[in-house]
């Protein structure tokens, strides 16, 4: 797989992703410390022995369910960004597709079958005990050399042989000799990975904290940066929470957080004229969207949210009320807040990292005609500030742990009267129009995916949050 189906010839980055996402910084450190031994064994002693070291350093003691979760939610994004274009051209043209790999099957099978249409995946089988990986492998061991050829024979039951075999190293020759035609994929530094828009199934949702594929050097940099980055994140969060909102923009700038503001935001509502507040309709990138909207305006804007951690409630500088998911209750609550002033809502209901907009809930369009779309986008170089599988309380910390995160807030024109519900448009028409307007501004694609679709894909549930009784609505970090 590495070097054949993928451009990169090293599997270390994918082991590092599993190590960090499941075991955290200390497991990643253990893997980095073990990597010189793995490299020495791989290149000078035995390819199989080197892979065994990586498997042990990564998997020993991990819950198998956690490994499967990372393989489903995290790895596909990184695998898909490294596909070899020429290999994919051959692979996709075949009627039946089988992948033989020395990588653990548990890591690669989900991506290969769901996104590349593989019919069969044969990989190294890891050893398990009471739901945890032991760090060792089952017989016949690592699938390299003769083991790979034997696995292919067993899979095809000696009744037929593959028409085409692709490999990239000498240890692939034994299984390639069993194929009617065999081709070597030679290493070429000039080959660029295939564009992801050519995949048969686009990757709309993915999880995990790391933005870049962690090579050994990048993994070491991440380990060294995390203590420094955490202190920097605490300082940035404290500045946002403690300083008056008009000063937050300048404090962020001094601390390396860039906020770019475009468009002409409306002035605050005047209570003396009985003017109701403006409802800002934002695309949803992280739970910090309302914070950066408030930073751009220089005044705190209340927000409504579905779920947020208690830690985020404590450190938030803006006032927000939780949605109950009861249509009548939520509508009355939003109307009441609009009578008090401006309000921000993210009608997607959950975040999306890729250039897609999820389906907009239409409830907001029924409650007011004072609608201002806001296109939110951000850039992070090291860590993602969102998660579906992990603890959301760390989301703001991971975002602010980036060396120089950037948020771009684009205020669009207020929705014309003739496009509102008051002028006869349906709430769904209004919601869809605003979704298309924001998508066009960001060069994103509109979808009909929802919160349930995201959490089903990434976490295996529908994203429903159980409200704790007696928990008063206070401050939250965003939607």
From Swiss-Prot:
Gene3D superfamilies: HAD superfamily/HAD-like, SG protein - dephosphorylation function. The chain crosses the membrane at residues 14-34, 37-57, 215-235, 237-257. The keyword Acyltransferase applies. A motif (HXXXXD motif) lies at residues 284-289. GO terms for molecular function: glycerol-3-phosphate 2-O-acyltransferase activity; glycerol-3-phosphate O-acyltransferase activity; phosphatase activity. Induction: Regulated by RAM1 during arbuscular mycorrhiza (AM) formation after inoculation with Rhizophagus irregularis. It is found in: Membrane. InterPro entries: HAD_RAM2/GPAT1-8, HAD_sf, Plipid/glycerol_acylTrfase. GO terms for biological process: cutin biosynthetic process; glycerolipid metabolic process; response to symbiotic fungus. GO terms for cellular component: membrane. Glycans are attached at residue 448. Its EC number is 2.3.1.15. CDD domains: LPLAT. Signal peptide: none annotated. It catalyses: sn-glycerol 3-phosphate + an acyl-CoA = a 1-acyl-sn-glycero-3-phosphate + CoA. Keywords: Acyltransferase, Glycoprotein, Membrane, Transferase, Transmembrane, Transmembrane helix. It comes from the Eukaryota. Belongs to the GPAT/DAPAT family. This is Glycerol-3-phosphate acyltransferase RAM2. It comes from Petunia hybrida (Petunia). The gene is RAM2.
């Amino acid at each position: 797989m590495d070097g054949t189906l993928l451009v990169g010839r090293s599997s270390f980055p994918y082991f590092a992703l599993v190590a960090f996402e499941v075991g955290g910084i200390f497991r990643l450190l253990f893997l980095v410390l073990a990597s010189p031994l793995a490299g020495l064994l791989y290149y000078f002693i035995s390819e199989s022995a080197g892979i065994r070291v990586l498997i042990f350093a990564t998997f020993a003691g991990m819950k198998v369910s956690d490994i499967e979760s990372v393989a489903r939610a995290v790895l596909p994004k990184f695998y898909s960004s490294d596909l070899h274009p020429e290999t994919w051209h051959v692979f996709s043209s075949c009627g039946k597709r089988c992948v033989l790999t020395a990588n653990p099957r548990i890591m690669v099978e989900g991506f290969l079958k769901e996104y590349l249409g593989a019919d069969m995946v044969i990989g190294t089988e890891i050893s398990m005990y009471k739901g945890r990986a032991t760090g060792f492998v089952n017989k016949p061991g690592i699938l390299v050399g003769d083991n790979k050829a034997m696995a292919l024979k067993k899979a095809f039951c000696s009744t037929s042989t593959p028409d085409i075999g692709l490999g990239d190293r000498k240890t692939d020759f034994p299984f390639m000799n069993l194929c009617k035609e065999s081709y070597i994929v030679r290493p070429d530094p000039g080959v660029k990975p295939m564009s992801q828009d050519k995949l048969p199934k686009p990757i709309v949702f993915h999880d995990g904290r790391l933005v870049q594929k962690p090579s050994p050097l990048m993994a070491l940099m991440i380990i060294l940066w995390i203590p420094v980055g955490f202190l920097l994140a605490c300082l940035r969060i404290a500045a946002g929470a403690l300083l008056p909102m008009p000063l937050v923009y300048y404090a962020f700038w001094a601390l390396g957080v860039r906020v770019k503001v475009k468009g002409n935001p409306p002035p605050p509502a005047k209570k003396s004229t009985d003017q109701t507040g403006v409802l800002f309709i934002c695309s949803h990138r992280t739970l910090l969207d309302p914070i950066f909207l408030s930073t751009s305006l220089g005044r705190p804007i209340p927000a409504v949210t579905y779920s947020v951690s208690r830690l985020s409630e404590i450190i938030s500088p803006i006032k927000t009320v939780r949605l109950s998911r009861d249509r009548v209750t939520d509508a009355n609550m939003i109307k009441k807040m609009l009578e008090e002033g401006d309000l921000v809502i993210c009608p997607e209901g959950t975040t999306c990292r890729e250039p897609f907009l999820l389906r907009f809930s239409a409830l907001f369009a029924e409650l007011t005609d004072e609608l201002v779309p806001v296109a939110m986008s951000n850039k992070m170089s090291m860590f993602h500030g969102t998660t579906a599988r992990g603890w959301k309380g760390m989301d703001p910390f991971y975002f602010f742990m980036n060396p120089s995160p950037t948020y771009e807030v684009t205020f669009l024109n207020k929705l014309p009267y003739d496009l509102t519900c008051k002028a006869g448009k349906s709430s769904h028409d209004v919601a869809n129009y605003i979704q298309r307007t924001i998508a066009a501004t960001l060069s994103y694609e509109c979808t009909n995916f929802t919160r349930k679709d995201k959490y089903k894909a990434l976490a295996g549930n529908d994203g429903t949050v159980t409200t704790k009784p007696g928990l008063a609505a206070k401050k939250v970090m965003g939607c």
